[in-house]
Amino acid sequence: MSLNFLEFEKPIAELEAKVEALREISRRGGENALDLEKEIKQLEDKCLELKKKTFSDLGAWEVAQLARHPERPYVLDYIEHMFTEFDELAGDRAFADDKALVGGIARLDGRPVMVIGHQKGRGTKEKVIRNFGMPKPEGYRKAKRLMQMAERFNMPVITFIDTAGAYPGVGAEERGQSEAIAMNLKIMSELSVPVICNVVGEGGSGGALAIGVGDYVNMLQYSTYSVISPEGCASILWRDSDKAPQAAEAMGLVAPRLKELELIDTIIDEPLGGAHRDHKATAENIKQRLLEQLKELDAFDNEALLERRYQRLMSYGYC
């Protein structure tokens, strides 16, 4: 897979390019092939050490860049690797079908579940169709419809959060964007089935929260969750979007800080270098955590499940 390298990854990219060049020479054969194998191994070891060093000490701004990586897996990638028999459901039964938010019935390890998530799209054409992963009110109303359907058929709800935010256009506001988000918060807090939310990329403000209320909230290691983007915060506080790195550090938008504040429950590890380097391994990590959490939630009856969720929500903030 051809990768887009971020600025802080460039030394890694240079080493990987050297390794690939030597491999190409080695593939051509010749009397020096065996000697090249030794040099390739040395470079690979050096590259691995550099990756470990680089990714062991990432700042909030670097994590924010990784969360937006164009090759990071989206909900449809997770559906492909984690679920079987996915049947997409469309439309909010009121206005339109929003392609920025995907949902449908699937099986997780044989168990029927409702899967809902943001889809940003790859390539210009798909990004436009998906509205860059920013849902309009009809997207959130579709999610509400699917969650209520899941409750009727006693299926757990699993969400994948990856959006810069809800679409702020005039039409979206006219059709009740804030009401659609608020209604989802209410519905999700009252569902009598297990709800597990996973922040897998950008968790942007109300657009993320609208499918982010659950019994468990998980975050991938290099995902973010905040009320505003670092650039937006910098523009408001300092009138300078170039100060986004400072804003990112101050906002506490990374998984360890949010876990410390008890705003999320679990941090799910990503492969070395980020989820974009190995979609399948990332999906497997999430799948195993979901299976563990569903097993735990199955021990609760409906009343106990709702009480647990209520207490979880009431624990947010400072008293």
Curated annotation (Swiss-Prot):
Pathway noted in the entry: Lipid metabolism; malonyl-CoA biosynthesis; malonyl-CoA from acetyl-CoA: step 1/1
Catalysed reactions listed for this entry: N(6)-carboxybiotinyl-L-lysyl-[protein] + acetyl-CoA = N(6)-biotinyl-L-lysyl-[protein] + malonyl-CoA
Transmembrane segments: none
Domain of life: Bacteria
Enzyme class name: transferase
GO molecular function (one): carboxyl- or carbamoyltransferase activity
Main location: cytoplasm
Record has Acyltransferase as a keyword: no
Keyword ATP-binding attached: yes
Occurrences of domain CoA carboxyltransferase C-terminal (ranges): 35-296
Entry EC no(s): 2.1.3.15
Compartment(s): Cytoplasm
InterPro entries from the UniProt entry: Acetyl_CoA_COase_a_su (IPR001095), ClpP/crotonase-like_dom_sf (IPR029045), COA_CT_C (IPR011763)
A Pfam family hit: ACCA
Keywords, sorted A to Z: ATP-binding, Cytoplasm, Fatty acid biosynthesis, Fatty acid metabolism, Lipid biosynthesis, Lipid metabolism, Nucleotide-binding, Transferase
Similarity comment text for this entry: Belongs to the AccA family.
Assembly notes: Acetyl-CoA carboxylase is a heterohexamer composed of biotin carboxyl carrier protein (AccB), biotin carboxylase (AccC) and two subunits each of ACCase subunit alpha (AccA) and ACCase subunit beta (AccD).
Function: Component of the acetyl coenzyme A carboxylase (ACC) complex. First, biotin carboxylase catalyzes the carboxylation of biotin on its carrier protein (BCCP) and then the CO(2) group is transferred by the carboxyltransferase to acetyl-CoA to form malonyl-CoA.
Listed name of the protein: Acetyl-coenzyme A carboxylase carboxyl transferase subunit alpha
